[in-house]
């Protein structure tokens, strides 16, 4: 199972989940202390569970799952605010591993932020991003997540969609990391996609950037960013192990 999601994974997921815009939230559950399930009903009928696991992943499901007999406090807050609210938008925050789900009801707009990086959180805010309730209260060096304060995402990651070739080359040449680590970390692409770009361009992931033809890396990156995303499962000896928005060559 995929355990780490990159910024590009989240971009693909946001695009896919946009088909659910217009659905209404009918139920909110918290089957596990790190997991929230929103049961969404489409305009055409039929329910789909939106499964949110803080710090890990986001996916949809239609399988039956046991739910707690009594809702946890966070689930109760979600039910109070989001029951019968309409999903208006699914947005990635920059190129970060954060999705914003925009809901609307007769009282106005509400945002549900889902952070899928290490020590991430799930945060319910009003339409002005004032925190109504986080899944867990937390204080970091650069932000605080607690009721009554303004939500602020983590420091913004580099968005590769904002780069042209010149700025890309400058960013790469200023890095003291290897090619693979720069693509995966500085550009927030993750290990799998950065490894695929290295393989596609005939480079070792540990190669020094000064020895790399960056025009080939740029072309491969553009293919990843602007290619057709369908979603692919890759299996190993123990079953399905990874999911990617495109076929990776490694």
What are these regions (language model features)?
Residues 1-250:
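Extended, highly charged segments
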């Amino acid at each position: 199972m995929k355990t780490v999601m990159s910024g590009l994974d989240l971009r693909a997921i946001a695009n896919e989940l946009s088909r659910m815009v217009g659905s209404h939230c009918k139920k909110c559950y918290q089957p596990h202390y790190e997991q929230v399930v929103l049961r969404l009903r489409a305009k055409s009928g039929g329910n789909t569970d939106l499964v949110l696991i803080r710090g890990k992943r986001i996916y949809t499901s239609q399988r039956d799952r046991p739910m707690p007999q009594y809702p946890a406090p966070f689930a109760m807050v979600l039910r109070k605010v989001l029951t019968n609210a309409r999903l208006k938008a699914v947005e990635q925050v920059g190129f970060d591993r954060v999705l914003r789900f925009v809901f609307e009801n007769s009282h106005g707009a509400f945002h549900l932020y889902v952070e899928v990086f290490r020590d991430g959180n799930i945060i319910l805010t009003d339409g002005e991003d004032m925190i109504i309730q986080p899944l867990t209260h937390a204080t970091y060096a650069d932000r605080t997540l607690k009721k009554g304060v303004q939500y602020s995402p983590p420091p913004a990651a580099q968005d590769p969609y904002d780069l042209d070739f010149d700025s890309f080359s400058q960013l790469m040449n200023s890095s003291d990391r290897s090619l693979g680590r720069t693509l995966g970390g500085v550009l927030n692409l993750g290990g799998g996609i950065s490894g695929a770009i290295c393989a596609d361009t005939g480079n070792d992931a540990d190669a020094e950037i000064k020895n790399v033809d960056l025009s080939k890396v740029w072309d491969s990156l553009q293919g990843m960013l602007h290619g057709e995303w369908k979603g692919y499962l890759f299996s190993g000896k123990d079953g399905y192990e990874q999911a990617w928005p495109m076929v990776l060559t490694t």
